[in-house]
Amino acid sequence: MSNTENKQKRVSVGKDIATRRRVARARRHFRIRKNLRGTPEAPRLVVHRSSRHMHVQIIDDVAGHTLAAASSIEAEVRATEGDKKAKGAKVGQLIAERAKAAGIEQVVFDRAGYKYHGRVAALADAAREGGLKF
């Protein structure tokens, strides 16, 4: 059997690259969530990143309630000039303001299987600058 035939056999049938990446991210998120738990003292700050927008929530896992939320879909963020990274930073500022208004100082950061890079890192840094402690 030639080397090219071996390579062709190793490719998983019926799964494109996008599906494999999505499944791998879901697996990473599952592994991360096994060790993270949001409490009333330190709720979980969870990030969701799509190709166009970012959503972030502060969740108390014990009560099962969302305490604060922010998104790049909001008009305040849409008006922000710049790239997606700048908009992610604006979402981080918003969630920090809303957390402070709700009396939240400390959070547990849940990156949801995404790399701590780019928009996710910009959001986290802006939230830290806004006064949230991770």
Swiss-Prot record:
InterPro entries: Ribosomal_uL18_bac-type (IPR004389), Ribosomal_uL18_bac/euk (IPR005484). CDD domains: Ribosomal_L18_L5e (cd00432). Keywords: Ribonucleoprotein, Ribosomal protein, RNA-binding, rRNA-binding. SUPFAM superfamilies: Translational machinery components (SSF53137). GO terms for biological process: translation. Transmembrane segments: none annotated. GO terms for cellular component: cytosolic large ribosomal subunit. It comes from the Bacteria. One of its GO terms (molecular function) is 5S rRNA binding. Belongs to the universal ribosomal protein uL18 family. HAMAP family: Ribosomal_uL18_B. Part of the 50S ribosomal subunit; part of the 5S rRNA/L5/L18/L25 subcomplex. Contacts the 5S and 23S rRNAs. This is one of the proteins that bind and probably mediate the attachment of the 5S RNA into the large ribosomal subunit, where it forms part of the central protuberance. This is Large ribosomal subunit protein uL18. The gene is rplR.
